[in-house]
Each structure stands twice: as C-alpha cells, then as structure tokens.
Amino acid sequence: MEKIIKDNGLFIKYNSKLIKNFDKKIFNYDYIEKAALSKSLEVGRARTFELNYENNIYILKHYHRGGFFQKIFRDKYIYTGDVNTRANKEWALLKKIKTYDLPVPEVAAIKVKKYIFTYKADLITKKINNTIQLIDFIKSNKMNDKLWEKLAITLKKFFEKGIYHADLNVNNILVSDNEKFYLVDFDKSFITDNEKYFKKSFARLHRSLVKNIKDKNIENKLLSIKKLIFS
C-alpha cells in the first residue's frame, strides 16, 4: 500500500507493506552514516548506498545529473509538480513493470525536496539478494552460450512490453546465483511502442560490453543475441 507524506516542501511516498515502520530519517545521509546503517556503493554517477533497515537491505539512490549540466546543477532539477519528478516517474515505471512479472527490484520509497523552482530527489528499492553485476559475472568466465541466450530472452520480454531502458549497460544488469537476469536503474526510462528505442537501448548495451569486455568473440555473441531479440 502506498502512503504519502507532505511537509514543508517535502514529498515522500513509501510502500507500507514493505517498510512497516517508516521513518523519513532513512533519507538523511548523515543519520544513516552515523548510525552505521549503510555502506557507500560505486554505481554510476548517482550517490548510492546499501541501507540496512528493519532487517532488510535496500539500495538508496540520490539523483545526480550527467553531461553538460552536471557542473552547473549537480543534483537539482526543474520542478513542475511531484508527479513529474524523476523519482516519481521511476517509482511508477517500476510498479508497472512489476505487474508484468518482469525481473526488476521492488520500489520501497521516494523523497522529493522542493525548493523555489527546483527539487532534489532520492529513491529506495529493495536489494535483489545474491546477485552480481553482469560485468563481474562475465569476467568470472561463467557466461556461456546458454546464458547469453537467456539474457537475450530476458531483454526481449522487456521490449515486447514496450519498456525502454535509458541506460542499459553492464552495471545495470544483475545476475543471481541461480542464473536469473535482473534489470535495475530505470531513471529516464519509459514505455513506448517505437522499436527504435529498443534498438537504441541494445546499442548502448553493445557499446558497454565492447568497452568493458576484452574478448575478440564479444561482437559475435552480441550479433547472435541481437538476432534473437529482434527476430
């Protein structure tokens, strides 16, 4: 069940079935660091923590800009309403994807702090246990032909539901110890029926794999799974 807190420019939405004793202090980075509730993670440009709360492990992400505006605005975005914030859009998309029974993290809470014309935002998702990033899984030499095909099938299921992942790369795909693939970090992602976005998403993954995996056979692997996905 979704619960909403509004207080002096603060907008918080949380899943009360997942976090039963919610306290907005879990969005306070100073508090969670001093209380030893978290550890910092290196995940892209966002400030990200692994958070231990109520005997569950969560991923806390603070939204940060990239590209040209990063140095100017850093973590601030133009405010046009709570529903239009990056955090709320990612919340809504993850909830929608869950209804398709696709492998994504469960969203737990979001926070939006409004200023005069701008806002800052955070998102908390439940950690998917016993997983590692695709990049590490491949480097461990566990990625065989069967698993490449399984990855292709997983991506195809997302695309068939019209889900465009805006930053599909080797860090945003997780592999569980039972060899199941998960997609994470859906910031700026959306649902569309335009196939060009799915090809754009796959092209991003292609570049990420070629850049990070020094294997002369990687291009052939990618060509094979591309055929499976878009056939």
Language model features: what each stretch is:
Residues 162, 167, 185:
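Conserved catalytic-loop position in the HRD/HxD motif
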